[in-house]
């Protein structure tokens, strides 16, 4: 509900199964009936339409908007050539991917993560079409199988790409790299586990000042309408957030045997909780100067 404030105390969670589980389906509405509610002084308009399953975007330094059309396997560029707030140039930059999602850019390459690989394509600022074929950076299955949570989001920091990989299922023991954030060195092509126990860390970003990694996580279902809260949190190398054996600290997941090596694990508590089953799907740190002063800090 826009404007409503929620406070969820991690030390006062309800007990598992103490609230009923609720299943809600979505209703697809015509865009003219779906005006976003925004604070006074803000305005939202349609920047682009008639896209096919757009799932993620990345804005380049010159304002070009890269869009992952996941179902079609394409990366598009949207450009506003007359600065009226509406894109008037749409081009397919590259295609042939398997459900592309994550997009990142540096001074030399456009990086793309799909369910099969992390890719790179030579890129010059302002370029509208790829001049060469995408280059595979990871090995086969290095980002897991395509079943379950299929989005592979990425963020670039100091020549390393951090890749969020969700679990295959709701609760279960799964092999790496499922339910992790992976760290990939673009200079050496070395891949390591960065953090674990994250059921679906679908959104990921770098704080512009501290240069720390943050993520939003979609938590598990099946324990009632008020468990388990989704969350936003900073992530450090080696962190374990509990899934599937624990949640929100050392709260034990019912009906699953905890292997001996996890019984004394230090489970990191997340920083900010969202209402259970909210399903946050991304985050971005705003570092521009258009917003009122009270919205900074």
Each predicted region: which residue ranges?
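A short loop-to-beta-strand structural motif that recurs across blades of beta-propeller domains
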Residues: 74-77, 109, 117-119, 180-182, ...
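Asp-box/WD-like beta-propeller blade repeats and closely related beta-sheet repeat scaffolds
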Residues: 89-90, 99, 104-106, 116-157, ...
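Blade-loop segments of beta-propeller domains
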Residues: 76-108
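Short loop/turn segments immediately following beta-strands, especially the blade-tip
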Residues: 78-83, 121-129, 235-242
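Beta-rich, blade/repeat-based domains predominating
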Residues: 50-62, 95-109, 113, 143-160, ...
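Residue position within the beta-strands of beta-propeller blades
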Residues: 66-68, 112, 162-165, 212-217
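Beta-propeller domain segments
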Residues: 2-39, 151, 167-170, 179, ...
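A detector of repeated loop/turn-to-beta-strand junctions in beta-rich toroidal repeat architectures
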Residues: 72, 87, 115, 131, ...
């Amino acid at each position: 509900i826009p404007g409503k404030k929620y406070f969820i105390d991690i030390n006062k969670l309800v007990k598992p199964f103490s609230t009923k589980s609720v299943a809600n389906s979505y209703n697809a509405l015509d865009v003219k009936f779906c005006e976003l509610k925004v604070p006074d002084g803000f305005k939202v308009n349609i920047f682009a339409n008639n896209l096919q399953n757009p799932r993620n975007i990345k804005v380049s330094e010159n304002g070009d908007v890269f869009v992952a059309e996941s179902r079609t396997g394409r990366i598009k560029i949207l450009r506003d050539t007359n600065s009226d707030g509406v894109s008037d140039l749409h081009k397919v930059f590259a295609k042939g991917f398997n459900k592309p999602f994550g997009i990142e850019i540096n001074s030399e390459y456009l990086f793309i993560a799909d369910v099969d690989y992390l890719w790179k394509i030579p890129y010059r600022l302002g370029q509208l079409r790829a001049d060469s074929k995408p280059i595979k950076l990871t090995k086969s299955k290095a980002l897991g199988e395509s079943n379950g949570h299929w989005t592979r989001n990425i963020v670039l920091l100091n020549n390393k790409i951090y890749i969020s990989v969700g679990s295959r299922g709701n609760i279960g023991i799964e092999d790496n790299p499922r339910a992790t954030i992976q760290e990939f060195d673009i200079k050496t092509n070395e891949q390591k586990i960065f953090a674990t126990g994250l059921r679906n860390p679908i959104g990921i970003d770098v704080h512009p000042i501290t240069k720390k990694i943050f993520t939003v996580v979609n938590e598990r279902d099946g324990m009632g309408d008020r468990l388990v809260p989704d969350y936003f949190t900073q992530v450090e190398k080696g962190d374990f957030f509990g899934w599937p054996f624990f949640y929100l600290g050392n709260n034990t997941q019912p009906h699953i045997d905890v292997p001996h090596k996890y019984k004394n694990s230090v489970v990191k508590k997340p920083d900010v909780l969202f209402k259970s089953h909210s399903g946050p799907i991304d985050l971005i740190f705003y570092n521009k100067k258009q917003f009122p002063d009270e919205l900074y800090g």
